[in-house]
Amino acid sequence: MFADLDYSHPEVEKDVLDWSKWLARELPLKGVRFDAVKHFSEDFLREVITGLDEEFGPGWFFVGEFWKDSLDDMCKYLERMGKKFSLFDAPLVYNFSKLSKTEGADLRTVFDDTLVKTVPVNAVVCRIPPTSS
């Protein structure tokens, strides 16, 4: 279970598309998170996005995990995927990590070379909710 799937195989693509539509019918979903999108066919992801939009209407949110520290690669990926797709801001995470390990770090640079600064509408950042006391 949960083994790697060959998304380049037409039958696998059809099954995953059918499954995503079934899931959307069964659960009150309006968004999908795709893991490790750089390992998927972009055409297949666009087909899933289009299929869900066409069958269930607009308003879906699609986000992908593209773990790379290259802002340029991420921006090019977003350009190819279109405006309906967002990515987690991996460069921002790297910046926070780097700043946390640097004595006297300048927090004003945390947004440099990040999706949040470059294409904020397509950037997703994780928020950790405050703990209740």
What are the residue ranges of the model-derived segments?
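Conserved aromatic-histidine-acidic binding/catalytic patches
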Residues: 4, 8, 32, 36-37
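Active-site-proximal helices and loops of the catalytic beta/alpha 8
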Residues: 19-30, 36-128
